[in-house]
């Protein structure tokens, strides 16, 4: 939108209501992308007010006086994220300001921002008002910045309320979506990128992909059936895995499961208690499983890849990662600590129960 129009609109909107009778006027509509000012005559019908210092949120924002509490600012995390998360009022103020001045918190001038070559046009809009999440990666994985290879910036599907977030989508991620095992078609790719429906939207997206050396075959059969994973970009799927790991670590009922397994084993006459109490072999088995899981990290947006010497294992893990958009790779490690704790806990509980006198065992079972 024209910068002069923003400036004119800002100077004509009064900061305080006028006391006393006022002639009825036609209300004006704020200049946004969807609706511009209806006419210059409508803007001129605003009542005049005495000159005074403008203490509106917009003025404070432009003068650098806005506080962290007023705007609900979050600390910046890089040059792509100079615009912090703001309240709805502050977001509207930024839109009116046209992002003419540097952000008062990060001291970075938006006019100097240059997206990577061939990045889509909606990247600036998404980055300006919403923080881009880069570090939502579970422990045990090495971070890799996706900025230099960014193809697009997409709003998260799982954001709630005003806590809107964005995620980077890299060129290689788009290549993974279009190749095996999913081979997504143009419609599914547009769903993945949350692209709006346009008359020639498919053509524009295919042209953008061609600029990055990715050819989209028309009328190709999609291998993946429509599912909920298709709608998630890899960075958001990894973020979901991080939150799942936190929930499992904090709330999974390990002790309750240990008690239940131990008592069921004692009640089963055919149960091999010696095998269940052999926690040494169980620990070695779980340790070997963890070693395999951590030896391979297929390419995922925001995570440093790590191949193993077993090419067959690498290919299998990469296929699984592509089919699950990275969620399967990060979530498979979530359960290992809990399952290891359950196995060792069952062995300890069985030893404790079997050491009691024989006549007291039925009482233990009843409990």
Curated annotation (Swiss-Prot):
Segments of this protein annotated with the region H-S-H (helix-span-helix), dimerization: 220-354
Family: Belongs to the AP-2 family.
Keyword Transcription: yes
Known partners and oligomeric status: Binds DNA as a dimer.
Keywords assigned by UniProt, alphabetized: Cytoplasm, Developmental protein, DNA-binding, Nucleus, Transcription, Transcription regulation
Resulting phenotype, residue 182 to K: In qm27; embryonic lethality and morphological defects in larva. Embryos show failure in dorsal epidermal cell intercalation, failure of ventral epidermal cell enclosure, and arrest during elongation
Pfam families: TF_AP-2
GO cellular component, one term: nucleus
Keyword Nucleus in annotation: yes
Compartments, record wording: Nucleus; Cytoplasm
Main location: nucleus
GO biological process: positive regulation of transcription by RNA polymerase II; regulation of cell population proliferation
Top-level taxonomic group: Eukaryota
Ranges where the record places region Disordered: 29-49
Protein's UniProt name: Transcription factor aptf-2
Protein function: Sequence-specific DNA-binding protein that interacts with enhancer elements to regulate transcription of selected genes. Required for neuroblast and epidermal morphogenesis, perhaps acting in cooperation with transcription factor aptf-4.
Biological classification of the source: Eukaryota, Metazoa, Ecdysozoa, Nematoda, Chromadorea
GO molecular function: DNA-binding transcription activator activity, RNA polymerase II-specific; RNA polymerase II transcription regulatory region sequence-specific DNA binding
Organism: Caenorhabditis elegans
Polar residues bias: start-end ranges: 36-47
Coiled-coil regions listed in the entry: none
